[in-house]
Amino acid sequence: MNPITYELIKTDKQTGARLGRVHTPHGSFDTPTFMPVGTLATVKTMSPEDLQSMQANIILSNTYHLWLRPGEDIIREAGGLHKFMNWDGAILTDSGGFQVFSLSDMREIKEEGVHFRNHLNGEKLFLSPEKAMDIQNALGSDIMMAFDECPPYPAEYDYMKASVERTSRWAERCLQAHNRPHDQGLFGIVQGGEYEALRKQSAEDLVSLDFPGYAIGGLSVGEPKHVMNKVLEFTTPFLPSNKPRYLMGVGSPDALIDGAIRGVDMFDCVLPTRIARNGTCMTSNGRLVVRNAKYARDFNPIDEHCSCHVCKNYSRAYIRHLIKCNETFGFRLTTYHNLHFLLKLMEQVRTAIKEDRLGDFKESFFEQYGLNKANPKNF
């Protein structure tokens, strides 16, 4: 029995977006969904109870960072990541590939894996498909990611073709090295940049290996929005309709809606938590930079249309004061609000799919959020 299964509930008649449910060893979650990122086994400033209160049923943790600190052996000794961090929902771990490949001046790619230097102390390290599986098996996440090559954007066709072929070979090695297929599902990652033929080749290679789910990688790496949307449009049809599809590293409201319309089920990004620590909040009318001086005497909530406990109890003036004074509680409030906002947005997306009106929802949301043509960057 596969530990990860996908149930397609319905498709939206306006857009073709999918309403579904993913079942894991640590519970089920409805899709499309957004996954908060807990890089170091914590979503910064949030407790597990905070995340449960906003109906976050799956979170993401980072293999590379947990390998370096505290080390996978300590987490294995603790009984796995769920026990270590007291989280009883589902956990997805990335493979560490993105972090290693982002150390472009500190790494060397070979067929066996990647040689690179620890960003903390300069120590020489080596990460391979086998090592990435070993670490993730020790962490015990519900969903593991294959170790892939993450090419830069833009990249020449020939470079990208060689990269796709290596990613396919590494995916096979990941499957062979995966020691816990009975209780951890391993997803393959489709690469290929903006080249349709290479996306097709990558998807077909991975689908032939019969992973329980598929990620679309190599997007949200600096390409324009229209390129991301175009790539999704020609990539998702190559993926099986009875398995979940995960768009990696995407978390702006417009990209979540556009991704869902193009058949994506799962998203993750540090965006809502990172901008929260800069005093930037997502609201139904676009971004609000609460640290700005104009909010010093503004006793309204961050978003009057928001039902989260932050908006019910705290004013912009108070939150601005906390952030200006570098008080952790201020970052906690903005983080809670932003995550609640995105999780609520995905709930609205699911309701719109259920009612066959996601196209209409997108139009009204984009207009109110300031994503019309006059102000396309307000995300």
UniProtKB/Swiss-Prot annotation:
Pathway: tRNA modification; tRNA-queuosine biosynthesis. Binds 1 zinc ion per subunit. One of its GO terms (biological process) is queuosine biosynthetic process. Zn(2+) binds at C306, C308, C311, H337. It comes from the Bacteria. Its cofactor is Zn(2+). Gene3D superfamilies: Queuine tRNA-ribosyltransferase-like. It is an enzyme of class 2 (transferase). GO terms for molecular function: metal ion binding; tRNA-guanosine(34) queuine transglycosylase activity. The active site is at D94, D268. Its EC number is 2.4.2.29. Keywords: Glycosyltransferase, Metal-binding, Queuosine biosynthesis, Transferase, tRNA processing, Zinc. Catalyzes the base-exchange of a guanine (G) residue with the queuine precursor 7-aminomethyl-7-deazaguanine (PreQ1) at position 34 (anticodon wobble position) in tRNAs with GU(N) anticodons (tRNA-Asp, -Asn, -His and -Tyr). Catalysis occurs through a double-displacement mechanism. The nucleophile active site attacks the C1' of nucleotide 34 to detach the guanine base from the RNA, forming a covalent enzyme-RNA intermediate. The proton acceptor active site deprotonates the incoming PreQ1, allowing a nucleophilic attack on the C1' of the ribose to form the product. Homodimer. Within each dimer, one monomer is responsible for RNA recognition and catalysis, while the other monomer binds to the replacement base PreQ1. PANTHER family: QUEUINE TRNA-RIBOSYLTRANSFERASE (PTHR46499:SF1). This is Queuine tRNA-ribosyltransferase. It comes from Oceanobacillus iheyensis (strain DSM 14371 / CIP 107618 / JCM 11309 / KCTC 3954 / HTE831). The lineage of its organism: Bacteria, Bacillati, Bacillota, Bacilli, Bacillales.
